[in-house]
From Swiss-Prot:
Keyword annotations: Cuticle, Signal
Function (record text): Component of the pupal abdominal endocuticle. May have important role in the larval and adult exoskeleton structure.
Gene Ontology cellular-component annotations: chitin-based extracellular matrix
Secretion signal, residue range per the UniProt entry: 1-15
Polar residues bias spans: 332-342
Superkingdom assignment: Eukaryota
Gene Ontology terms, MF aspect: structural constituent of chitin-based larval cuticle
A Pfam family it matches: Chitin_bind_4
InterPro entries, per the entry: CHIT_BIND_RR_consensus (IPR031311), Cuticle_Struct_Prot (IPR050468), Insect_cuticle (IPR000618)
Database matches in PANTHER family: CUTICLE PROTEIN (PTHR10380), CUTICULAR PROTEIN 47EF, ISOFORM C-RELATED (PTHR10380:SF173)
Protein name: Pupal cuticle protein 36
Keyword tRNA processing included in the entry's annotation: no
Domain Chitin-binding type R&R, residue spans: 135-198
Originating organism: Manduca sexta
Amino acid sequence: MKLFVLAAVLGVCLADRLDNKYLPPRGNAGAGFGPGFGGAGPKGGGSGFGGAGSGFGGAGSGFGGAGSGFGGGAGGAFGHGGAGSGFGGQAGGYSGAGGAGGYSGGASGQYSGRGGAASADANAQILRLNNEVTAEGFAYDFETSNGIRADAQGVATNGVQSQGSFAYKGDDGQDYSITYTADENGFVPQGAHLPTPPPIPEEILKSLEQNARDEAAGIVDDGTYRGEGAGAGVAGGYSGAGGYSGGAGGAGGFGAGGAGRAGGAGGFGTGGAGRAGGAGGFGAGGAGGAGGAGGFGAGAGGFGGRGSGGFGGAASRQYLAPNAGGRGSGSGNFNAQTGYQY
């Protein structure tokens, strides 16, 4: 039991110890990261962050060895500066070599890209400023000491209509100015230095002018080719003779007249006894047509035939005329019992 208690006490004591490798490297005697803000460093005789009688540094030491201090009164900052400098010194700043200038210097100097010289634009004064707004319109103008000028005036009748100008002096010493108008035609600026669009090529300009003349003359060009061979290949196809939508008189077609829709020799078939009948077809008129014998029409033996035979016939039970074989002449006699006879 005593051994257990002794081991526990020893373990607690060792647990409080921080190994050296977790600490920053130990510096020379008289310099280093001391532990306290108010007490002297452990082994450096006045080293550390908080030596008595000084700022962050020890009593005469800091980051940079003897005679320096992080905020000391007479040492150089980081070991680089001479007498009279320091991070928060009285007469120096973060300049490394002492003297005026720095981020947080004391009595003299400030951080500036021009060595402390005041910028002319930052210290510009307003020389003139007028701003008038009434029910009829507005007007304003101003001018500054560094060469900036602007003015504008306008009315709010039938929309805002205004005009004005703007000018300033560039870094090259030249004056740049713009005048403008803003009304129903939009914003139109003018100025010698404004970029201008490139000229239109001559060929494109001629084409635009020709298009304008054609439109004025009522000529409309939709881009369709109308030269040699235009329209070729339109004839034929479904609308040719004998096609599905043949014209009047097309042999064997659906069209009106001739052999086809309107009757005549041939129909949907090839004549003779068959689906289309002999001399007749889908159309009306003629033998086998809409009133002819053996056609699909309303003639004798047709689909809606009022005579004998056919789908609508009263006397015959056959639906189609018998196939006579080969190509018939289309001029036979029709019998309701036996069909066509040639």
